[in-house]
């Protein structure tokens, strides 16, 4: 009677062969198997003697039946897991979490829950072990054809079956068999270690988006909930006192909290106890109080830009105003821009549009005023318009006979927080020898300007009815004062031709305005920053040469910016210069950069309530965008038309 192993070797059906593969048993064949790449080839000999395999784990029932019948009765059933009824991928979620029922509890006890554990560690097969990898195992997981799975189907040689079964079982199963055969604890993935020590970081880069969303991570489910709870605690203002920071209680760096709200929390009792009509300098929650001022200006200093330019009535405006409004010497833009124009262009609206276009959407036109050909425009950062009072203006005409208001003064005033400002732009009488007329223009201006009107004086005890400059905390007076350099053109040109640098201090000794200010006959209490630029008048249009006409006017510092303060040291000049690149007029624009001390105020003043020129704002933005599109199209056409030549 033939042995059981012999019967099985000659009578195994395809379905039985598949069952052996699913239980981890190799197919027993008498023919040579084609080796799979990456595995050890089988021996050239036939039979189980030359290719030893571990004994089968199929229990044999003792019976007197025919061996062929016994072989047919021994039909191993595939395990419930893994199911190879469909094509699986190593990246499939179910494949990463697969576990055998018999080893699931043991793995949990031995290894514990680790969010860094891989799928190969979590899957351990309870199957017989083999001393070396099987030649029929492949790296692919293919679906077993149903026609081949039917029990009792026949046909095909063992060699053909080995070729067909190649690629049915993945490398993962092979690894699991090896782990089970070792008898020890399941293998673990090696810990990840940096190849080198990373550099020290001074910023927190904690981010929920960088956290691995591993399904085996027990903390993943409630991670978002914990983060939301932390933010609620950080931004909660229901406590008995105001937190020190909107980010109080949060362990994130301020630099990494860009998605958090940086608005200061407002206590409910501050809103209920506060009265709009009766403000206080130190009232908590006051709109113009110290607390609000500290939010925007911690050092209580605001940046101010003041400029003057005699445009000579030219209709043509410069192609760019960047050098005028955005000088390269300033790293940052200013909080307030005040521009005074004398002999302005006929289209005042176009001029203001150009200013809005240059400054961009971060600034709005707070107010603008005109007196004949005298223009003044005030642009402020859009987030500061809520702290301005109503803007008032007044005018003075010094040339009464003329119907055209070319000479005179224009004053604009308002209060910012608790500091009152007065800006005056003037065009005094021209002529080398008309110093007395210019002194008269000054006296008439300080007496005739009727400011302020509705906004109360911040310090009425230090005000004078005969001098408008005494009624405000900070005063800036700028314009074309027409004071000349005495001594004649020849003497002035001799100074200008000095090399390598012009001795400006020696040149200013001949300045009429400097001489009159030292006498105290004009601009009493005013100061001027040191001058380090060349005379701003009179140039040939479009050129850097001074007047070459028959009149041969003497180069002079006619365009000036002066300042005055009630409190000494409140105004600090940062830069005082001219714009030699703007050559559309016979005058060069002159500007000054200042830091001005700002004090808290009361809420009982008439506020502008965010009023600004909305129409001009929209026009400036549209023009800015259209020019940017044109510039980009020009760059594209230029790059596409470039020709590369090889010589």
Swiss-Prot record:
Compartments, as annotated in UniProt: Cytoplasm, Cytoskeleton, Cilium axoneme; Golgi apparatus, Golgi stack membrane; Cell projection, Ruffle; Cell membrane
Catalysed transformations (reactions): a 1,2-diacyl-sn-glycero-3-phospho-(1D-myo-inositol-4,5-bisphosphate) + H2O = a 1,2-diacyl-sn-glycero-3-phospho-(1D-myo-inositol 4-phosphate) + phosphate; a 1,2-diacyl-sn-glycero-3-phospho-(1D-myo-inositol-3,4,5-trisphosphate) + H2O = a 1,2-diacyl-sn-glycero-3-phospho-(1D-myo-inositol-3,4-bisphosphate) + phosphate; a 1,2-diacyl-sn-glycero-3-phospho-(1D-myo-inositol-3,5-bisphosphate) + H2O = a 1,2-diacyl-sn-glycero-3-phospho-(1D-myo-inositol-3-phosphate) + phosphate
Record note on quaternary structure: Interacts (when prenylated) with PDE6D; this is important for normal location in cilia.
Tissue specificity: Highly expressed in testis, in pachytene and diplotene spermatocytes, but not in more mature elongating spermatids. Detected in neurons throughout the brain.
InterPro entries: Endo/exonu/phosph_ase_sf, INPP5E, IPPc
Chain intervals for the UniProt region annotation (3 X 4 AA repeats of P-X-X-P): 52-243
Covalent lipidation (S-farnesyl cysteine), chain numbering: 644
Membrane topology annotation: Peripheral membrane protein
PANTHER family: 72 KDA INOSITOL POLYPHOSPHATE 5-PHOSPHATASE (PTHR46625), PHOSPHATIDYLINOSITOL POLYPHOSPHATE 5-PHOSPHATASE TYPE IV (PTHR46625:SF1)
Protein's name in the database: Phosphatidylinositol polyphosphate 5-phosphatase type IV
């Amino acid at each position: 009677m033939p042995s059981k192993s012999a019967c099985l070797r000659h009578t195994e059906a395809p379905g039985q062969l598949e069952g052996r593969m699913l239980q981890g048993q190799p197919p027993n064949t008498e023919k040579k198997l084609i080796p799979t790449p990456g595995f050890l080839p089988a021996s050239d000999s036939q039979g189980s003697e030359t290719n030893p395999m571990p004994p089968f784990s199929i229990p044999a029932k003792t019976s007197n039946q025919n061996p062929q019948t016994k072989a047919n009765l021994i039909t191993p059933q595939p395990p419930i897991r893994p199911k190879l009824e469909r094509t699986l991928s190593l990246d499939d979620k179910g494949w990463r979490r697969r576990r055998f029922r018999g080893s699931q509890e043991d793995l949990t006890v031995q290894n514990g829950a680790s969010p860094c554990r891989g799928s190969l560690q979590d899957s351990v097969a309870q199957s017989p072990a083999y001393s070396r990898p099987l030649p029929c195992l492949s790296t692919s997981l293919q679906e077993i054809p149903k026609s081949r799975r039917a029990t009792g189907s026949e046909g095909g040689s063992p060699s053909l079956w080995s070729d067909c079964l190649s690629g049915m079982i993945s490398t993962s199963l092979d690894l699991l068999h090896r782990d089970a055969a070792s008898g020890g604890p399941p293998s673990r993935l090696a810990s990840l270690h940096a190849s080198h020590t990373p550099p020290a970081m001074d910023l927190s880069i904690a981010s929920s988006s960088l956290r691995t969303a591993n399904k085996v991570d027990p903390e993943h489910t409630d991670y978002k909930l914990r983060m939301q709870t932390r933010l609620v605690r950080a931004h909660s203002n229901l406590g008995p006192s105001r937190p020190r920071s909107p980010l109080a209680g949060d362990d994130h760096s301020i630099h990494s909290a860009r998605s958090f709200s940086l608005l200061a929390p407002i206590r409910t009792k501050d809103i209920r106890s506060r009265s709009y009509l009766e403000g206080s300098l130190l009232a908590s929650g006051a709109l113009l109080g110290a607390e609000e001022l500290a939010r925007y200006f911690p050092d209580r200093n605001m940046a101010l830009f003041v400029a003057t330019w005699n445009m000579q009535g030219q209709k043509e405006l410069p192609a760019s105003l960047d050098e005028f409004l955005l000088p390269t010497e300033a790293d940052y833009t200013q909080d307030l821009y005040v521009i005074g124009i004398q002999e302005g262009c006929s289209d005042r609206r176009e001029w203001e549009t150009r200013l809005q276009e240059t400054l961009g959407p971060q600034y709005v036109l707070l107010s603008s005023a005109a007196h004949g050909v005298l223009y003044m425009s005030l642009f402020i950062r859009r987030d500061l318009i809520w702290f301005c009072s109503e803007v008032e203006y007044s005018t003075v005409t010094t040339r009464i006979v003329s119907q055209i208001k070319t000479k005179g003064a224009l004053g604009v005033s308002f209060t910012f927080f608790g500091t009152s400002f007065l800006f005056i732009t003037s065009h005094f009488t021209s002529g080398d020898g008309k110093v007395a007329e210019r002194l008269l223009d000054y006296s008439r201006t300080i007496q005739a300007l009727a400011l302020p009107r509705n906004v109360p004086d911040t310090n009425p005890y230090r005000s004078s009815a005969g001098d408008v400059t005494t009624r405000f905390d900070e005063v800036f007076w700028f314009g074309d004062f027409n004071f000349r350099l005495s001594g004649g053109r020849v003497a002035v040109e001799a100074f200008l031709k000095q090399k390598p640098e012009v001795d400006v201090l020696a040149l200013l000794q001949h300045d009429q305005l400097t001489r009159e200010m030292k006498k105290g006959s004009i601009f009493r209490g005013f100061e001027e920053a040191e001058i380090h630029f060349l005379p701003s008048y009179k140039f040939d249009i479009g050129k850097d040469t001074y007047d070459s006409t028959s009149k041969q006017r003497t180069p002079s510092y006619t365009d000036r910016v002066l300042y005055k303060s009630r409190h000494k040291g409140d105004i600090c000049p940062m830069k005082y210069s001219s714009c030699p690149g703007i050559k559309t007029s016979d005058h060069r624009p002159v500007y000054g950069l200042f830091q001005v001390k700002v004090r808290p105020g009361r809420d009982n003043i008439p506020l502008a309530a965010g009023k600004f020129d909305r129409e001009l704002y929209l026009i400036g933005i549209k023009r800015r965008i259209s020019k940017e599109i044109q510039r980009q199209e020009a760059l594209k056409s230029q790059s596409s038309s470039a020709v590369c030549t090889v010589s």
